[in-house]
Amino acid sequence: MPEFLEDPSVLTKDKLKSELVANNVTLPAGEQRKDVYVQLYLQHLTARNRPPLAAGANSKGPPDFSSDEEREPTPVLGSGASVGRGRGAVGRKATKKTDKPRLEDKDDLDVTELSNEELLDQLVRYGVNPGPIVGTTRKLYEKKLLKLREQGTESRSSTPLPTVSSSAENTRQNGSNDSDRYSDNDEDSKIELKLEKREPLKGRAKTPVTLKQRRTEHNQSYSQAGVTETEWTSGSSTGGPLQALTRESTRGSRRTPRKRVETSQHFRIDGAVISESTPIAETIKASSNESLVANRLTGNFKHASSILPITEFSDITRRTPKKPLTRAEVGEKTEERRVDRDILKEMFPYEASTPTGISASCRRPIKGAAGRPLELSDFRMEESFSSKYVPKYAPLADVKSEKTKKRRSVPMWIKMLLFALVAVFLFLVYQAMETNQGNPFTNFLQDTKISN
């Protein structure tokens, strides 16, 4: 006969399921938490190890569970929960009168008497992975174990353990109790992921709202509030016209037949000030391309004459109305255009005037190509041909030829005369610098001396 574990919480959920199925134990419908399978294991498999009377035997090991203990929603610890956390912290000796003294109460009282291995087993039972228990860390782990037992007793006393049965109530159990006792949290995260799959349904439900918002934004994009000035004339007033600012919304001129506009400015008629927020009912009669806005006054406007300003506007207007140009401005613009045209003609006198300012001449046909016969007229320049191109800068060869012509303009006899004068001057200088007696001018010099 195989021996089953006394503490099946050490096993994982999948291992518990496989053990229960292997021993012909019916599992509850649906996905349950781990503690439900632990209770099934204790009820059906652990009870097969020995008869229920052996469960009350004295032993220092961890407490043995029996079928009777599982069916009763009694807490693991006999102190703290019923009397209160204060008494449990002071002595932890108070117990319920209805509870029977069991080994669990002794363990609660004798936490300090447990060995290191037993203390380690108790901590592992509550889902804690302790380190090595030494003399310095033993007190810390003892406090931790007491705290875990207090939490376990409070949770069990407040909500009893569910009894496992094959009825439909097992499908409603969620096992929210004693979640800290078991370290198998991987399966819980999987369940959360399954619940998160419902988010696309919310997104589908919100799609009509976004479509409505887009439609309203699309309709608002066509709207443009334009401020138009309308002139009001009163019957008894002698002053100038009254200018009232009215806002016209072109959006939905066909959809909304009537609007109510409130003017928020002060207007003066014969010294009388019209208070703010004066209602003006605008009746819009929509037609195919234009709509008529009839403004009707109430209250203070009874003395005014009949007023029906009519404004024509299209269903969708994107451009703001432009101010009419005066005659002076029109004349200035025409003068500027004329001046610009005159300047262009001065810059390009031989260019033909075109609306775009770009002129092009036709290409002359290529003679002799594609088997065409050559003619002598092709090599002669036609007299009627005139080039419209006016070169701005002359080539450098022409400049050099002009310079050479200017140099040749000096007559030749002037050059010869200048050459003779220079030669005589140089000869005289040369003769004056000689000191020998063979001077040809010595006779002339001597005759001048004798005459003196």
Curated annotation (Swiss-Prot):
UniProt modified residues of type Phosphoserine: 59, 66-67, 79, 82, 155, 158, 165, 167, 176, 179, 183, 189, 221, 223, 249, 253, 264, 291, 305-306, 314, 361, 377, 384, 401
How does this protein assemble? Interacts with LMNB1, LMNB2, BANF1, AKAP8L, GMCL and chromosomes.
Q: How does it sit in the membrane?
A: Single-pass type II membrane protein
Record keywords, A-Z: Acetylation, Chromosome, Citrullination, DNA-binding, Isopeptide bond, Membrane, Methylation, Nucleus, Phosphoprotein, Signal-anchor, Transmembrane, Transmembrane helix, Ubl conjugation
Q: Which residues form the signal peptide?
A: none
Q: What does this protein do?
A: May help direct the assembly of the nuclear lamina and thereby help maintain the structural organization of the nuclear envelope. Possible receptor for attachment of lamin filaments to the inner nuclear membrane. May be involved in the control of initiation of DNA replication through its interaction with NAKAP95.
Indicate where the modification Phosphothreonine is found in the sequence: T74, T153, T159, T163, T210, T311
Sequence positions bearing Omega-N-methylarginine: R85, R87
Q: Where is this cross-link: Glycyl lysine isopeptide (Lys-Gly) (interchain with G-Cter in SUMO2)?
A: K400
For the region Nucleoplasmic, what residue ranges are annotated?
Answer: 1-409
Q: In the record, what terms sit under GO molecular function?
A: DNA binding
Region annotation NAKAP95-binding C: residue ranges? 299-373
PANTHER family, per the entry: LAMINA-ASSOCIATED POLYPEPTIDE 2, ISOFORM BETA, LAMINA-ASSOCIATED POLYPEPTIDE THYMOPOIETIN
Q: How is it modified after translation?
A: Mitosis-specific phosphorylation specifically abolishes its binding to lamin B and chromosomes.
**Which InterPro entries does its entry note?**
LEM-like_dom (IPR013146), LEM/LEM-like_dom_sf (IPR011015), LEM_dom (IPR003887), LEM_domain (IPR051656)
What Pfam families is this protein classified in? LEM, Thymopoietin
Q: Where is this region: Binds lamins B?
A: 298-370
Its recorded name reads Lamina-associated polypeptide 2, isoforms beta/delta/epsilon/gamma
